[in-house]
Amino acid sequence: MSFYLEEEVEVDFQFDYAELAQRVVDFCLDYVAFPYEAEVNLTLTDNEGIHAINKEFREIDRPTDVLSFPMLSYETPGEFSFLDDEDSDDFNPDTGEALLGDIVISIEKVYEQAESFGHSVEREYAFLITHSMLHLFGFDHMEENEAKVMEDKQKDILNKMNILR
């Protein structure tokens, strides 16, 4: 599994955020029984940085907490039988790892939301990574029934990791 972390801004978390991110990504891969080694990229930025990305790629002119850019196209969320390791579009030709996608998180939003939800910065950070990983597995929350499934999975993952509110 390849996990790449890019820091566009200074990160002043009071915990090992690289280790936590790796743990959450690994746990999510195991949770959905992802059948291949995977590649995931995480970029940590600020509100200005995520605002620019949100505007460019989603045409939404404001910062957000997390953006997910899945590289795979799913017919059914969390169902991976469509993947073919002979298909070079889905796999890194150098490593053979499935290209899951990119996660972008606003550090400022992590702090803001941790305070507003009344839980730790560490928990908010882990939640946003979990949320985004589920998007990389094809889950969404546009419809009420989809949102319920995604919320239940997020809660279950964080509870099993003992990352509680």
Which residue ranges define each predicted feature?
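Conserved ATP-binding N-box helix of the HATPase_c
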Residues: 134
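An acidic/histidine-cluster motif and surrounding catalytic segment
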Residues: 1-126, 137-165
